[in-house]
Amino acid sequence: MVTLKFVFNQEKLKQARKTEEELLQPMREHAKKYDIAEPEHGFFVKDGEDAMCVIGMAVPDITDADPHYIDYMDEWTFDVDGEVEDCIEETKKWWKHERKRGVYYDEE
C-alpha cells in the first residue's frame, strides 16, 4: 500500500490567507484522475502495481506549480509499504541540487 499524508501548519496558512482545502485541491484533482482514495482528510491511499508511481508523481507536480507549498506544511510523508520518505526534506534536497544548475528558486 502507498500513502501520501499532508499536515498543514495552521498558523502559516492563516498568515498567508490560504486554506487546507485550497492547498489539497491539486492533489484531489490528481487523485480523481488516478483513482486514489482519500479515506481521511489529507491522507491519500492507493494499492496495486501503479500505486507508487501515480501517488509519487503528485509531489513534483505540486511543488513545481507552487514552490512555496512546503512552507505551509508541518508534515508531508510518502509511505511505500512502511518505508517512509519525508517529502519536505526531499523537496528541499532536490531544489538545492537544481539551484546549482540555476533552475529553482532560492529558499528564504
Regions found by a protein language model. Give the residues of each.
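Short, flexible N-terminal segments of the mature chain
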Residues: 18-38
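Short, conserved charged micro-motifs
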Residues: 13-17, 52-54
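Short, internal active-site loops enriched in acidic
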Residues: 11, 49-51, 83
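Short acidic DE-rich linear segments
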Residues: 103-108
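Short, extreme N-terminal segment that most often corresponds to the first beta-strand
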Residues: 1-14
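Short, intrinsically disordered low-complexity segments
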Residues: 32-69
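Short, mixed-charge low-complexity intrinsically disordered segments
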Residues: 62-93, 97-99
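Short, low-complexity, polar/charged sequence segments that are solvent-exposed and flexible
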Residues: 22-27, 41, 63-64, 97-98
